[in-house]
Design a protein with these regions (language model features):
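Short acidic, gly/pro-rich beta-turn/loop elements at beta-sheet edges
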Residues: 64, 74, 84
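Contiguous, well-ordered beta-strand patches that form the walls/edges
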Residues: 18-19, 30-71
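Tryptophan-anchored aromatic micro-motifs
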Residues: 1-39, 74-76
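Beta-turn initiation residues at beta-strand->coil junctions
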Residues: 56, 76-78
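Coil-to-beta-strand transition motifs
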Residues: 69-72, 81-83
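Edge beta-strand at a domain terminus
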Residues: 3-6, 78-92
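Ser/Thr- (and often Asn-) enriched beta-sheet segments in non-cytosolic proteins
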Residues: 10-12, 53, 87
């Protein structure tokens, strides 16, 4: 199974550090068929899945690392600079 397939589904996201705003309960990622969107307070930010990277059209990249069963640690980067870190877990 490829990473894209493993990432398919709906994910809850929460901040773990850096300059990202609080996210618990207000941010979700929806992923399917090699693309997806981050939904924050009703606003959608679309991305494409590139292995374990989520690439947004405006220079933002979320780099993911497996972090347990149905969970990933993430680093949000803008033009190669770290903005912050987050953890995403599969929504039930």
């Amino acid at each position: 199974m490829s990473e894209g397939n493993e990432l398919a589904g709906v994910w809850d996201v929460h901040r773990t550090g850096g300059f990202l705003p609080p996210m618990r309960g207000i941010v979700r990622k929806r992923i399917e068929d090699g693309h997806g969107c981050t939904v924050a307070a009703g606003v959608r930010f679309r991305f494409v899945v590139d292995g374990l990277r989520l690439r947004y059209p405006f220079g933002l990249v979320d780099e993911l690392v497996p972090d347990g069963h149905d969970a990933y640690g993430g680093t949000a980067m803008l033009f190669g600079r770290t903005l912050g870190t987050f953890r995403m877990t599969r929504a039930i």
